[in-house]
A protein has these predicted regions:
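Alpha-helical "lid/cap" subdomains adjacent to substrate-binding clefts that gate access
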Residues: 8-88
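Conserved AMP-binding/adenylate-forming
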Residues: 11, 68-173
Length: 173
């Protein structure tokens, strides 16, 4: 069926499909002429500045951008969401690495795309971003789902400090 008829609240998507959604949105904006396209691009820049990395949305002096973001949401971004049925609260991205820029775009238009991480042989989901203040950071796979424990080990099984590459080892109850 047509996504506008179904009016979903949540969308599960692989990054490649989300990229196509973005291309279609941008093509639709482009068709409306250079003035609309410039306004849309400016609105994105303002929303990007306000949202920053998602985790620090509206912090510091950026709170002053909130009225402008709300205006652009009402006159532009709401129409983008209507193209998806108007009810989408968030996307869940999985199956491949989700580009932070793609997350930034969908967050700006009011359809946050949440990244998760999982292994079918371990458990379907190991970590995930979620909605809420300070719970969503672009380019991150979020917090570890409880009661799981994650460690990064070197090739000899020694635990590695944060930021050092190694093998991901997961333990659950």
């Amino acid at each position: 069926g047509n996504i506008r008829e179904v009016k979903p609240h949540v969308l599960l998507s692989v990054p490649a499909l989300a990229k196509n959604f973005r291309k279609n949105i941008e093509a639709s904006i482009h068709k409306q002429g250079p003035k609309v396209e410039k306004l849309f691009n400016f609105a994105l820049k303002v929303a990007y500045a306000y949202n920053r990395d998602g985790y620090t949305k509206g912090k510091g002096l950026r709170f002053m951008l909130k009225p402008l973001v709300a205006l652009f949401d009402k006159i532009l971004f709401k129409k983008v969401r209507e193209g998806f049925g108007g009810n989408i609260k968030f996307f869940v991205g999985g199956g491949a690495l989700l580009d932070a820029e793609l997350q930034r775009f969908f967050y700006a238009v009011g359809m946050p795309m949440l990244q998760g991480y999982g292994l079918s042989e371990a458990t379907p989901i190991i970590s995930a971003n979620s909605l809420g203040k300070g719970r969503h950071r672009f380019g991150s796979s979020g917090k570890v789902i409880q009661p799981l424990e994650i460690k990064i080990l070197d090739h000899e099984g020694r635990e590695m400090p944060t930021g050092v590459k190694g093998e991901i080892v997961i333990k659950g109850e």
